[in-house]
Amino acid sequence: MEHQENENNQFTNDFSIQKERKVKLGENISNDNSLLLSQKANKSVCEVIRKDGYGSGFFCKVIFENNEINCLFTNNHVITEEMLSKKDENIEIKINNQIYKIALNINRRIWTDSELDFTCIEIIEKDNLLSIIDPFEIDKNSYNIEFELENYDRKGIVITSIGQNKNIELGYGAILYVKNTEDRFLHDCNTVEGFSGGPILLMSNIRLIGIHCGYEKENKKNLGIYFKKILEYIEKKTIKISIEIESNEKKEDIRIFNQNEDNKEEIKDNVKVYLNNKKVKLINNGDQWKINYDFKKDGIYELKIVFTRNISNTSGLFEKCNIISIDLSNFDTSKVNNMGYMFNGCNKLKEIKGLNKINTSNVIDMGVMFQNCSNLEYLDLTYFDTSKVNNMEYLFFSCNKLKKIKGLNKLNTSNVNNMNSMFQKCSNLEYLDLSNFDTSKVKDMGLMFSYCNNLKEIEGINIINTSNVINMNGIFQQCTNLEDLDVSNFDTSKVNDMGYMFSRCEKLKEIKGINKLNTSNVTIMKSMFQKCSNIEYLDLSNFDTSKVNDISFMFNCCDKLKKIKGLNKLNTSNVNNMNSMFQNCSNLEYLDLSNFDTSKVKDMGLMFSYCNKLKEIEGINKFNTSNVLNMKAMFQHCNNFENLDLSSFDTSKVSDMDFMFNDCNKVREIKGISQFKANELVNTYSMFQDCSSLEYLDLSNFNTSKVTNMSNMFNECYELKEIKGINKMNTSNVTNLRGMFQKCSNLEYLDLSNFDTSKVNDMAFMFNKCLKLKEIKGIQKFKTSNVVNMKAMFQECKKLEYLDLSKFDISKVDDLSFMLYSCKSLKELNLKNFKAKKDSNKVNLIAFISDKCHLILE
């Protein structure tokens, strides 16, 4: 088989041209070494069988890393990269009309290069060829053909074994041109179809100098590949990379690879970089290797990195390097044990060629290998040998353009113990086949598929072995396109963390097998089902939560959830956090928490907030809240409650009650509120806001000495007629009273005689639209020296008849607008000593006063 190229290239297998040269095979050359050579060639040369023809090959001993190995040599166009990639197939050769098979699924060294046009396959004992073949032997140190040809007979010969039942064929001629700096040389040895891949030797000393590869049209001569160049290629571990130089980028000191503590001695003095076959200056800067080159213009440049010594550790080798493509086809990684961080942060990398050829048989660590390769769309791991790998954490993390990982289903993961964040943020993956994953040793699956937003199917997830897994935190978090999930076979007996496990699986309608999960060792269930917004039913009847300490956000935003079976059986004796546990469960109507032990709970903030349809919480009246610190927005927007019995609530340690009952607009009574002591209370902002059906509040036991914010505390309590204990409230630390009683349109009387307002800076809207308010006792004692805003403070207090503001210090007030707007019933207004910061403010203030009002100014 001759080399086939298009008409623009120098090679051809146009046999009509060769026939014009009157090729004569098997001429009598008995005066030289042809007889001896023919006998040797019976065991040294073979036919390479192809589906579409045949070519030649030969066996040769070469020295590789101080070891002698036997190899089969031929052309790359005879044994192609495509043929080599089919590991389940064999390379077939014929020796003395006997067919032999070379298996590709066995670990062996293989080199191939389409530019140099050669393929070299190591022959090993399992091939059963070593006792049959008689390889050529070479001395790699004596090659200097360019000069030696002057001293030798330049007669050469090409040997082949071709065709059905044919013997060894010899094609002889002259070696015309050899130069040490070039890959190819010219010869006119007689050849026909099938000679490609045959050895070229000097007849004078039976010396191997090359491989026949084709025909040059221009000179009408045959071409040989200089064997010295092939040996150099094999000896040098070459990586090809492409970098892109942009106009706004510094064109000097460009980082192209890195070293680490384990490989710096292997790299030192053993690496060279070439651009257009010219050596480029290398600069070592700590762990970074850079090139110093004056690029004349922007564009893409291909560099060759040549390692003259094997590297055992490629950890971080190209981390954060400005590479757009890389070719590892000829990089020998047979001794590498660590590939962690190898391409981490290569965010311009679009292509990794030859990844399916690298030897990973000794690799132990692949953690973070492709992390943040955010421009990669495809990876071929078909022939990755991961049998020794124990770490795959963050392997593909944030490869957010990655659409396909070929060969994933064939990875040997039998020794892997860490898969944390393995596919996290692979937001373009739609399908994963893990059907052959052996996860029997895996301990960590935390965040394994998290943020795979387009993932629709994980084949094999129902059969993976999780018997040793300890961490499942966020394993399926934000898999927003998963519709089905079967965890029936999950063995979770050792798992201690299930936080965020199914969080934001927004299309998931059912989690098959959830009732079978063994949770006996789980301590964290935070956000476990958060925003599973399509799930209507959960069966937790077999959940053992005796060790769980955090169930905050557990069902948060499950807005279609109608029933949670087994909730009343959950053991919460060790739980300390229930923050937002049922928040936004807007379809739940009933909760049975009668067996909840809340004695250790510290946080109940937002626990039932926005449960819009919730009508009853059985057992809420038995809650032990003696250790609770936070009740912020606990019942916010529970606007279907009519009654709340909190008679068992101990609030002595609670510091935050902001929004606690906000928008509970059907609640008429909060039983037990009178017992609230709240000795540590700091915030009551909007605590009862929009409790629009509440008629009575007894806050006589409230200790508000530490409270700083009471703004909107009773805002929009339209039906509120009495606030018992308001006259005893300690407001000495309050800074904000904005809107505190706003729209309390049924309040007729307020006794604020004990209010200490010395630290208050905002009183805007404080009594705004208290439509029935007739008297505010103690208003004349207010200390307002720090207040800056009194906007609309008494606006539309339409029943207010007397106001004494003579002690008001408004020297710092910036806004008095609408302060007394529409106070239509005012009979007397005392503004004596009322000195506004701006006269215009005072003018505007009294402009709205009725003519019937007795105005005291001096």
Region locations from a protein language model:
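C-terminal cap/linker of serine protease catalytic domains
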Residues: L208, H212-K237
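Serine endopeptidase catalytic core focused on the charge-relay Asp
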Residues: K40-Y54, E68-I69, F73-R184, L202-S204, ...
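N-terminal activation segment of mature serine protease catalytic domains
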Residues: F11-V62, L72, F118-T119
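Short, solvent-exposed loop/turn segments that connect beta-strands within catalytic domains
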Residues: I63-I69, T181, L202-R207, E218-N219, ...
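Negatively charged
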Residues: T238-E858
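Short beta->alpha transition motifs characteristic of CBS
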Residues: N75-V78, S161-N165, E193, G210-E218
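PEST-like, low-complexity acidic/proline-rich intrinsically disordered segments
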Residues: M1-Q10
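Catalytic nucleophile loop of clan PA
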Residues: F58, L176, N190-C213
